[in-house]
A protein has these predicted regions:
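N-terminal glycine-rich phosphate-binding loop and ensuing alpha1 helix
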Residues: 2-49
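Hydrophobic/aromatic residues located in beta-strands of well-ordered beta-sheets
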Residues: 5, 45-47, 95, 125, ...
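Short, high-confidence coil segments that cap the C-terminus of an alpha-helix
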Residues: 42, 90-92, 119-123, 214
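A conserved hydrophobic position in a structured secondary element of the catalytic/binding core
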Residues: 49-50, 105, 182, 229
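Short phosphate-binding loop-to-helix
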Residues: 52-112
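Conserved core of the sugar-phosphate nucleotidyltransferase
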Residues: 105-196
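Conserved alpha/beta core of the MobA/IspD/sugar-nucleotide pyrophosphorylase nucleotidyltransferase superfamily
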Residues: 171-243
Length: 243
C-alpha cells in the first residue's frame, strides 16, 4: 500500500463560514488538522481547497496544496480532482480523505482507516465507533452504520448507512466517522457515478458506492473525533488543544 492523505477544504460553510482558517491558539484550524495527520504518519499530506488563502495556510503548515475550482459536487470530487494534479502517474494507490474540521482526531484513529484495505476485495475503508446513548442514536446529524463485528474482529463489512438508529433490536450500534481510505481505482470510479436514489434520499454520498456494488468495510475505534461545525465546537477544540 502506498497511501497519500488529502484534506478537502473550502471557506463556504452554512454554520461556520471560513472555518478552515478559524483561529485556534494563533494558528488556523487547517494547520492543526495537518498536525494530526502528520502525527499519524500515513504518507505525504496535501490539501485540496477552493480558495488560495487556504492553500497559503496549508503550505505554511508544510503541506502541498492544490486549488480546485469550486464547481465540484462534493469533497470527494475535490480530492479526486486534486489527485490528478498531485499524482498524474498514479504512484499512490490509496487516497485517505480526511475532513478539514477534525483538529482533535487521534493519530491512532486515523491510522485505523487503512486496516480494511488489507482485504484486497475491499474498495473503500472507513471508521465507526460505539454510539454513546439513545440521544445520539436518534440524532439525524449522527450517521449510523449497519455492520456486525464477529468476536474480536476489528473490521467488518459496512452493509448500510442511515441517519436513523439502525439496526433494529438489541445489540451495539455504530456511529460512522467520515474518514475514508479509497483505493485509487475506486476513487476514480466513484466520481464518475451518478448520484444514486438512496444517496439522495438519505443525503449520504457513501450510499452511491454501495448501490454501485462497491465494497466498503469499517474499522472500529473506541473514540470518534468531533467535527467543528459551530462556534461552540470551535471553543471546545480550543479548550482541548490548549498549550
Amino acid at each position: 500500500m502506498r497511501p497519500i492523505l488529502v484534506i478537502p477544504a473550502r471557506m463556504a460553510a452554512t454554520r461556520l463560514p471560513g472555518k478552515p482558517l478559524a483561529d485556534i491558539h494563533g494558528r488556523p484550524m487547517i494547520a492543526h488538522v495537518l498536525d494530526r495527520a502528520r502525527e499519524a504518519g500515513i504518507g505525504p499530506l496535501a490539501v485540496a481547497c477552493a480558495e488560495e488563502e487556504i492553500a497559503e495556510a496549508a503550505r505554511a503548515a508544510g503541506a502541498q496544496a492544490v486549488v480546485v475550482a469550486d464547481d465540484v459536487p462534493s469533497g470527494t470530487d475535490r480530492v479526486q480532482r486534486a489527485m490528478k494534479a498531485l499524482d498524474p502517474d498514479s504512484e499512490y494507490d490509496v487516497v485517505v480523505n480526511l475532513q478539514g474540521d477534525f483538529p482533535t482526531i487521534r493519530p491512532e484513529t486515523l491510522r485505523a482507516v487503512l486496516a480494511p484495505l488489507e482485504d484486497p476485495s475491499v474498495d473503500i475503508g472507513t471508521l465507526v465507533c460505539p454510539i454513546a446513548d439513545e440521544v445520539e442514536a436518534r440524532t439525524d446529524s449522527f450517521v449510523k452504520c449497519a455492520c456486525a463485528f464477529t468476536g474480536d474482529a476489528m473490521v467488518a463489512p459496512a452493509l448500510y448507512f442511515s441517519r436513523l438508529p439502525i439496526p433494529w433490536g438489541e445489540g451495539p450500534r455504530w456511529h460512522h466517522i467520515g474518514v475514508y481510505a479509497y483505493r485509487r481505482a475506486a476513487l476514480d470510479r466513484f466520481v464518475t457515478l451518478p448520484a444514486s436514489p438512496l444517496e439522495l434520499r438519505e443525503k449520504l454520498e457513501q450510499l452511491r458506492a454501495l448501490e454501485a456494488g462497491m465494497k466498503i468495510s469499517a474499522a472500529r475505534v473506541e473514540h470518534g473525533p468531533f467535527g467543528v461545525d459551530t462556534l461552540e465546537d470551535l471553543e471546545r477544540a480550543r479548550a482541548l488543544l490548549a498549550p
